[in-house]
Amino acid sequence: WGEEREIAVLFADLRGFTSLSEEQLPYDTVFVLNRYFAAMGAAIEEAGGHVDKFIGDGVMAIFGLQGDFELAKQQSLVSAVNMARALDRLNESLADDLPQPLRMGIGIHAGAAVVGEMGYGSTLGMTAVGDVVNTASRLEASTKEFGAQLVVSEAVLGNTKAEDPCSERHEISIRGRRGMLAVRAYAAATDVIRQTATG
């Protein structure tokens, strides 16, 4: 089956892991990645999200498969906070095994997408395609440009205070998309809790 639905999409990616993995044995790289994926998967599911797929050292998650769009947006933000805290705990437990702490970037966007069972054979699974997915991926990539852990579109945040001290507001262009997209960049993903609690 397939249908159009309003959802929130989250992308997260480890920063500098490729160069980090070159300094480690293959077994150690797999061990660290599996610990990371387990921690991120649990953080996403605890917030009510669906882990769509793991790609390299990144993860894509979908929120809103049950149909509540406002709840989906809130869940995606809670997930980002959960993931940041889970990464901190993971870094503590792996401190003796890593030359430096793991870092990640998270991008979140919300809007209409086509949702359904897609794939082939054993890869068949629930996923989403469309502009909202591409945009969320682009926002994750923009965390590097802004030196932020989290970049989230104002479509997700809703009524955002202009004077929000926890974030920087930017307008960015997305390839294949008309106009500029208003986003908020947070140096620490946990800062979004303060903003949404008072916004």
Enumerate the language-model features and the residues they cover.
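A structural signal for short, well-ordered beta-strand segments
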Residues: 9, 59, 104-110, 183
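Alpha-helical scaffold within the catalytic cores of cyclic-nucleotide enzymes
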Residues: 33-49, 65-106, 131-142, 165
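Catalytic strand-loop-helix junctions within cyclic-nucleotide turnover domains
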Residues: 62-72, 106-126, 143-146
